[in-house]
């Protein structure tokens, strides 16, 4: 399996599990992962948020860990990467307002490179205009954005543990789907894990 170079777009209050788990899983699988945030440099940190499902009408939010960046967003050359990961949390709400972020996402989509997005991550895909004609899972509150931009929203299972693959696009509704989401993304990357 050839090692892939993967870009992870993050920002302050990215969901804690949704940044930490895929970052570590992809490293364990032998890939190189660069995490970058607009306005920050390699070595800087982003704050994370922990979202949980505790029985209320929506998720709860608590302060999470700090996550250290290992790439500088202002120096990115998206053509040097094989795949893209967009975690959820609060960060996609403002990342989607950055024209350079949208340009980076559009490069991956138009080049047919693998893209993985989870929870609120598809907000960035919707803003970049790359969901037209695609089926996509996301946190339920993001469903209307997927639909209004021409995508087909794939609802979460009752346990939020499903992932959906549409060509090079791998999406999931929230962190309970990490096993299915990462398994599907690794398959799209051509990574084989055997027991």
Q: Residue locations for each model-derived region?
A:
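Extended, subdomain-level signal for the structured scaffold at the beginning of enzyme domains
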Residues: 1-111, 124-135, 143-195
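Short, thiol/selenol-centered motifs that function as redox-active sites or metal-ligating centers
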Residues: 118-121
